[in-house]
Amino acid sequence: MQDLQKIIDDAFENRASLSPAAAPAAVRDAVAEVIAGLDAGTLRVAEKKDGQWVVNQWIKKAVLISFRLRDNEVIPAGGLNFFDKVPTKFGDYTPEQFQQGGFRVVPPAVARKGSYIAKNVVLMPSYVNIGAYVDEGTMVDTWATVGSCAQIGKNVHLSGGVGIGGVLEPVQAGPVIIEDNVFVGARSEVVEGVIIEENAVLSMGVYIGQSTKIYDRETGSITYGRVPAGAVVVPGSLPSADGKYSLYCAVIVKKVDAQTRAKTGINELLRGA
């Protein structure tokens, strides 16, 4: 693995010289191995180690290099033609591969090659980008998008129209991470490497980026970039310092433990906010 990483790191430093017509075989093979690992779930852009999320920057570099090594080509899909550098994940799947994968793909859902879809995942008509990891039992509902390199945990529900942002550049930036058992309400957006910790609930229409204030009404504290475990979050606003206007924020209205979260319906948690 260290040899593979070194090839990718060195190639990224010299990426301006790479093209479909000019790239060493070792670089092509290394990039292909990384994309195949992402596709199979054996490699991940980010993984949790000792309770902390660690970003594998070299894997993001491999994804970026892959764009330089391929020309756009016609990609047929269901009677339509598309023109892109990255093939679709399921374009050459056999019935046996779908059975082995153990997930459902409802037309016209699209996942790109280099994304991982685990067992018991349901992809309603949705989109999953390269480098993304969607873990077991997760529902990606209609018109939801999972951006490049986003990490989605087990038993997550991404409701209709949810946008999970992608982060490829800058390389050092972390991806959006949605941990296990999180519910993200319809039309919500989580972008810019924000982390939603396990068992959290986001109501419909919550928008969170790195500059979004996350206000905890119990403590009065304001944080950025991370929603704590078990938090129930709704859209809200905070007054300006001069009191002349208000600006959008996300409001933590309560926190629940895993047991309460498992036993309580989403609507019940959100009522009375």
Swiss-Prot record:
<keyword id="KW-0220">Diaminopimelate biosynthesis</keyword>
<keyword id="KW-0808">Transferase</keyword>
<dbReference type="GO" id="GO:0008666">
    <property type="term" value="F:2,3,4,5-tetrahydropyridine-2,6-dicarboxylate N-succinyltransferase activity"/>
</dbReference>
<comment type="subunit">
    <text>Homotrimer.</text>
</comment>
<dbReference type="InterPro" id="IPR011004">
    <property type="entry name" value="Trimer_LpxA-like_sf"/>
</dbReference>
<keyword id="KW-0457">Lysine biosynthesis</keyword>
<comment type="similarity">
    <text>Belongs to the transferase hexapeptide repeat family.</text>
</comment>
<dbReference type="InterPro" id="IPR001451">
    <property type="entry name" value="Hexapep"/>
</dbReference>
<dbReference type="GO" id="GO:0009089">
    <property type="term" value="P:lysine biosynthetic process via diaminopimelate"/>
</dbReference>
<feature type="binding site">
    <location>
        <position position="141"/>
    </location>
    <ligand>
        <name>substrate</name>
    </ligand>
</feature>
<feature type="binding site">
    <location>
        <position position="104"/>
    </location>
    <ligand>
        <name>substrate</name>
    </ligand>
</feature>
<dbReference type="InterPro" id="IPR037133">
    <property type="entry name" value="THP_succinylTrfase_N_sf"/>
</dbReference>
<dbReference type="GO" id="GO:0019877">
    <property type="term" value="P:diaminopimelate biosynthetic process"/>
</dbReference>
<keyword id="KW-0012">Acyltransferase</keyword>
<dbReference type="GO" id="GO:0016779">
    <property type="term" value="F:nucleotidyltransferase activity"/>
</dbReference>
<keyword id="KW-0028">Amino-acid biosynthesis</keyword>
<dbReference type="Pfam" id="PF14602">
    <property type="entry name" value="Hexapep_2"/>
</dbReference>
<dbReference type="Pfam" id="PF14805">
    <property type="entry name" value="THDPS_N_2"/>
</dbReference>
<keyword id="KW-0677">Repeat</keyword>
<dbReference type="InterPro" id="IPR018357">
    <property type="entry name" value="Hexapep_transf_CS"/>
</dbReference>
<dbReference type="InterPro" id="IPR005664">
    <property type="entry name" value="DapD_Trfase_Hexpep_rpt_fam"/>
</dbReference>
<dbReference type="InterPro" id="IPR023180">
    <property type="entry name" value="THP_succinylTrfase_dom1"/>
</dbReference>
<protein>
    <recommendedName>
        <fullName>2,3,4,5-tetrahydropyridine-2,6-dicarboxylate N-succinyltransferase</fullName>
        <ecNumber>2.3.1.117</ecNumber>
    </recommendedName>
</protein>
<dbReference type="GO" id="GO:0005737">
    <property type="term" value="C:cytoplasm"/>
</dbReference>
<comment type="pathway">
    <text>Amino-acid biosynthesis; L-lysine biosynthesis via DAP pathway; LL-2,6-diaminopimelate from (S)-tetrahydrodipicolinate (succinylase route): step 1/3.</text>
</comment>
<keyword id="KW-0963">Cytoplasm</keyword>
